[in-house]
């Protein structure tokens, strides 16, 4: 019999990417089929044709009777069976190698993107995210481990189905050709035999024992395939019931505005207010409102330049409104809410109309505020 080492090395690589049932199936294939076929079975069928004798001297009669009784040798039939049931497993191994090759390409591309981000400062987060999604799709985990999911899982299930089909097909073919037992005497009536002759088989009982043993091994392999198929199927159903979702498809809703970032009636945001808050009454022409970064999620970090510009605009507005003799609306008279200052609002009497309060600024005043601070206004409150 030929050398089985090449096939054995290929099938041995499948062990790392198979389930427990698949590993048991491979062990049965190696020990009870390949090893037994290469040692005991081959020696039992070594004299198969030479020891086949018929009670006639007609030349060629023994050959045609042997061909009629055994269209294919049992040993060669079992070799074909082993090859056919191993092909689906080898195809699954080819898919695993394809995934590993994809992993190498994705890792190389990921390293290149990281180098570009470090040298040029480019934003490659989206590209890295796409690479992670592809790795998850192919079933690639950290440290080069391949997990059975997606297309790889489907290939594994298909390989189990084909192995089961081949097992059943070869069992039926064997039963149809010569059954599962051998007789000591075979009757043959075929040209060029002059009449019906009797032919005798060498060691029929020993060969029958090996046939039954190989039959049991085939049935065990078929049972392992069916058990593994149900195991993979129910495990997939169990994972779906548990609600294991894709980590790269998490549901994220819109961020809700912070509750302690000021009242929604103000038209400024203080760096963190919700952009959907209702606006205050329209500001006078030329009123430039400088806001902080809306994307900042913390209410403690403010843009210093924006705060100074807001105070300058507020002082200029008070100066302009004081010269015109009009009062400032309540929406602009409110002091800006800075959480770091922790300013408490003042309570007014119910009979007095709400008027703008004078604000004591601890910071340096701008030019506009310094000119307007010395001018009295008729709507100032006495404190």
From Swiss-Prot:
Listed Basic and acidic residues bias regions: 339-352
Residues carrying Phosphothreonine: 276, 327
Membrane topology per record: Multi-pass membrane protein
Region annotated Disordered, chain positions: 318-383
Residues covered by region (Interaction with NOV): 245-383
Membrane-crossing segments per the record: 24-44, 77-97, 157-177, 209-229
Keywords: Acetylation, Cell junction, Cell membrane, Disulfide bond, Endoplasmic reticulum, Gap junction, Isopeptide bond, Membrane, Phosphoprotein, S-nitrosylation, Transmembrane, Transmembrane helix, Ubl conjugation
Post-translational modification: Phosphorylation at Ser-326, Ser-329 and Ser-331 by CK1 modulates gap junction assembly. Phosphorylated at Ser-369 by PRKCG; phosphorylation induces disassembly of gap junction plaques and inhibition of gap junction activity. Phosphorylation at Ser-369 by PRKCD triggers its internalization into small vesicles leading to proteasome-mediated degradation. Sumoylated with SUMO1, SUMO2 and SUMO3, which may regulate the level of functional Cx43 gap junctions at the plasma membrane. May be desumoylated by SENP1 or SENP2.
Modification type Phosphoserine: residues: 5, 256, 258, 263, 307, 315, 326, 329, 331, 345, 366, 369-370, 374
PTM sites of type Phosphotyrosine: 248
Compositional bias segments (type: Polar residues): 318-333
Any GO BP: adult heart development
Family matches, as InterPro entries: Alpha_helix_dom_sf, Connexin, Connexin43, Connexin43_C, Connexin_C, Connexin_CCC, Connexin_CS, Connexin_N
Gene3D superfamilies: Connexin43, Gap junction channel protein cysteine-rich domain
Biased composition regions of type Low complexity, renumbered to the chain: 363-375
Principal location listed in the UniProt entry: membrane
Keyword Lipid metabolism belongs to the record: no
Record topological domains on the Extracellular side: 45-76, 178-208
PANTHER family in the cross-refs: CONNEXIN, GAP JUNCTION ALPHA-1 PROTEIN
Protein's name according to its UniProt entry: Gap junction alpha-1 protein
Organism in which the protein naturally occurs: Bos taurus
Protein encoded by which gene: GJA1
């Amino acid at each position: 019999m030929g050398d089985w080492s090449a096939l054995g090395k290929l099938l041995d690589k499948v062990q790392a990417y198979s389930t427990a049932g698949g590993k048991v199936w491979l062990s049965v294939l190696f020990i009870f089929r390949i090893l037994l076929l290469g040692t005991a079975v081959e020696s039992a069928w070594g004299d198969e044709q030479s020891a086949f004798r018929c009670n006639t001297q007609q030349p060629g009669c023994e050959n045609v009777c042997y061909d009629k009784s055994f269209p294919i040798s049992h040993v060669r039939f079992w070799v074909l069976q082993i090859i056919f049931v191993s092909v689906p497993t080898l195809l699954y191994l080819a898919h695993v190698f394809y995934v590993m090759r994809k992993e190498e390409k994705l890792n190389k591309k990921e390293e290149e993107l990281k180098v570009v981000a470090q040298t040029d400062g480019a934003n490659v987060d989206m590209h890295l995210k796409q690479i992670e999604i592809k790795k998850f799709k192919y079933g690639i985990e950290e440290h080069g481990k391949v997990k059975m999911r997606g297309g790889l899982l489907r290939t594994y299930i298909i390989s189990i189905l084909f192995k089961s089909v081949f097992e059943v097909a070869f069992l039926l073919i064997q039963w149809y050709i010569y059954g599962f037992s051998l007789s000591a005497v075979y009757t043959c009536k075929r040209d060029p035999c002059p009449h019906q002759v009797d032919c005798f088989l060498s060691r029929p009982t020993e060969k029958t024992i090996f046939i039954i043993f190989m039959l049991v091994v085939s049935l065990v392999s078929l049972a392992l395939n069916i058990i593994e198929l149900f195991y993979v199927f129910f495990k997939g159903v169990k994972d779906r019931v548990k609600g294991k979702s894709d980590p790269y498809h998490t549901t994220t809703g819109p961020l809700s505005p912070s509750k302690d970032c000021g009242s929604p009636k103000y038209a400024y945001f203080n760096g963190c207010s919700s952009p959907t808050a209702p606006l205050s009454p329209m500001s006078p022409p030329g009123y430039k409102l400088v806001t902080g970064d809306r994307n900042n999620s913390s209410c403690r970090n403010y843009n210093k330049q924006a705060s100074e510009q807001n105070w300058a605009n507020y002082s200029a507005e008070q100066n302009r409104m004081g010269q015109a003799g009009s009062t400032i609306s309540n929406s602009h008279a409110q002091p800006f809410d800075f959480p770091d200052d922790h300013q408490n609002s003042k309570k007014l009497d119910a009979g007095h109309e709400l008027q703008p309060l004078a604000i004591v600024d601890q910071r340096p005043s701008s030019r506009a505020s310094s000119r307007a601070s010395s001018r009295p206004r008729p709507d100032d409150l006495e404190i």
